[in-house]
Amino acid sequence: MVVGDGRACLSNEIAADLDLEVIRYSQVWEDYTLLEQAYCIREDYRILSVGSAGCNVLALLLHRPQAIIAIDMSLAQIALMELKFIGIKYLSYPEFLSL
């Protein structure tokens, strides 16, 4: 995984006020079916997605693309996404839902 500080691409005024070390979204509420319809995902696709809380990335994985590249300016959001992936791998469904 390549990680960088997203503030480098922003104006100084915006970057000064942007705290990338807090979790802003713990769950995404957008309708992921819109993404699915827009992508028309096939198994040979490589998809670029905003990481955010990881919900859309997980939904897109159900279509078994070749790869998904998830990006986010916030290291906290990336860490949350990774924790969700690890939780899915190692916890039971009820344990995961209780988080």
Model-derived regions, located:
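General structural signal for secondary-structure boundaries
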Residues: T33, I69, K89-Y93
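Conserved alpha-helix/loop element of class I SAM-dependent methyltransferases that forms part
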Residues: R24-R46
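Conserved acidic E/D residue at the C-terminus of a beta-strand in Rossmann-like folds
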Residues: A70-L75
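Conserved class I S-adenosyl-L-methionine
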Residues: E43-A53, I68-I69
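Class I S-adenosyl-L-methionine-dependent methyltransferase module
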Residues: G6, A76-L99
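Conserved SAM-binding loop of SAM-dependent methyltransferases across substrates and taxa
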Residues: A53-P65
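N-terminal regions that are enriched for targeting/export leaders
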Residues: V2-Y25
